[in-house]
């Protein structure tokens, strides 16, 4: 489905830049016949979305999301973790879910948006302002060890190569991998 060209989501224009034109990007949507995942046909350079603009979505600003994340984290702790296990979140945003592991576990977040990571760091959540790459996964494994739990929330929609992304986990995983996504697996 071709929906034309649009400015990036979350790229609000300041008053001083109102006369400047927003860059436009193609919005063409496709669906995988096999798994039914809906995704963009043209990939926008991730730097355009996460590095060149102030990313505006903060998980901590979403009403009741922390309650959901607490329930989710409590379930993971009960079923899979022992004290001091390493927990890694990819696309951790400002650390809302990681805060529920902070007391008894070694935690690390990875998120490419620097302004979001600054908020996580202010909350005492160790977070790397990076894209999750093969190089970074090896670095984390070397410096932090293997993760007992790796998870992400609503990140799949932001990936341009899911298979390549998932391959990076082989360097890090020592336990469970969780991915919270918004598509029906039926």
Predicted regions: what they are:
Residues 1-63:
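N-terminal juxtadomain amphipathic helix
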Residues 8, 177-186:
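Short, glycine-/aromatic-enriched active-site segment of Class I SAM-dependent methyltransferases
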Residues 83-93:
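Conserved class I S-adenosyl-L-methionine
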Residues 94-105:
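Conserved SAM-binding loop of SAM-dependent methyltransferases across substrates and taxa
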Residues 148-151:
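A conserved beta-strand element that flanks and buttresses the S-adenosyl-L-methionine
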Residues 163-178:
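A short glycine-rich, Lys/Arg-flanked "PGG" loop and its adjoining helix->strand segment in the class I
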């Amino acid at each position: 489905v071709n929906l034309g060209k649009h400015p990036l989501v979350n790229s609000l224009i300041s008053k001083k830049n109102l006369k400047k034109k927003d860059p436009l990007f193609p919005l063409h949507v496709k669906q995988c016949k096999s798994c039914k995942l809906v995704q963009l046909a043209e990939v926008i350079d991730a730097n355009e979305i996460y590095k060149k603009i102030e990313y505006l979505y903060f998980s901590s600003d979403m009403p009741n999301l922390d309650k959901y994340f607490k329930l989710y984290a409590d379930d993971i702790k009960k079923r899979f973790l022992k004290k001091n296990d390493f927990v890694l979140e990819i696309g951790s945003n400002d650390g809302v879910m990681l805060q529920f592991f902070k007391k008894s576990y070694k935690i690390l977040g990875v998120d490419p948006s620097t302004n979001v990571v600054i908020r996580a760091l202010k909350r005492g959540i160790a977070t790397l302002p990076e894209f999750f790459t093969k190089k970074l996964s090896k670095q984390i494994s070397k410096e932090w060890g293997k993760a007992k739990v790796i998870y992400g929330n609503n990140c799949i929609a932001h990936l341009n190569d899911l298979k390549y992304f998932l391959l990076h986990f082989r360097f890090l995983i020592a336990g469970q991998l969780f991915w919270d996504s918004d598509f029906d697996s039926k």
